[in-house]
Amino acid sequence: MFGVDELGLDLGTSTLHMVVRGKGIVLSEPAYVAYDRQTRNVVAVGEEARRMYGRTPAGLIVERPLRDGRIRSFDLVSKMLRYFLRKVVGKRATFRPKLLLALPGGMAPSERQTLVDVIVDAGVRSVVPVDEGVASAIGAGMNIDIGGGRTNVSVFSFGHQIVWDILNVGGDRFDDAIIDYLRKKHNLLIGARTAEELKIDIGSARMRGVKLEMDACGRSLVSGLPRAVTVSSEEMIEALDEPLRDLMSALHRMIERTPPELASDIFDEGITLSGGGAQLFGLDGVISDQLKIRTTLADEPDLCVAH
């Protein structure tokens, strides 16, 4: 528990971060909720709920309240935030901190207001919203912020967002592509957790100096029985080809929409990648090669918004 009056909240699609002024990041947990199917009572939140994903009995459901950059359940968001707020500030009923909220990009005004109302109801005094793209740029300069559900692409000038776009490509799309690849190439059905582990451990946007391999366990689509196959980092390049091509096409369109003066600034200063999805091996090099613009990975890319 922390004695705090002001909090920062990065409500990410896959991970939630809370920040305390003067103390930095005090909480970083997966944005998962496990609840009873009939009563909708919450039984686990965060890392505990994530560990249950894909392994729950029929009466329990584990899901992420946010998906593809959109809020799927305001009720679950409220319950999740109540849990995390108690974890950070304690159970004092009269203590209600002020909260700076990094909003997922592309939310409709009505959706934003509903989210703000839900957060206030969860136990904060007031909410100051800011776009994730702006928050990540404050942390790392002009950047491409690749989240779990979406990618925010922003160009700033004198502190103002001049050109921006929201792309339906993110870490979840990478996971789905890996699942689809193993289904087609190896007749193996794997879960989202296994796909994420493959992405993190051997996922690649370009050739590595050393070939990596990892066993992927799932269900054979031929026999219906459990089966394991060995997957290489080179196969991951093939698996991720389609979402990466979509990402590059969208980035090309964004550059074309940028005023010439700002495009010149981008060329001179380069691009910074942030967000959890930006950690895919070789992605910075692929973007740099294809856009002909120096591209670097931010320090602690998954924490840029929180910082």
Please provide the spans of the model-predicted regions.
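Nucleotide/phosphate-binding catalytic cleft detector across ATP-hydrolyzing
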Residues: 1-146, 156-272, 278-306
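A structural feature that tracks compact, well-ordered secondary-structure segments
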Residues: 152-154
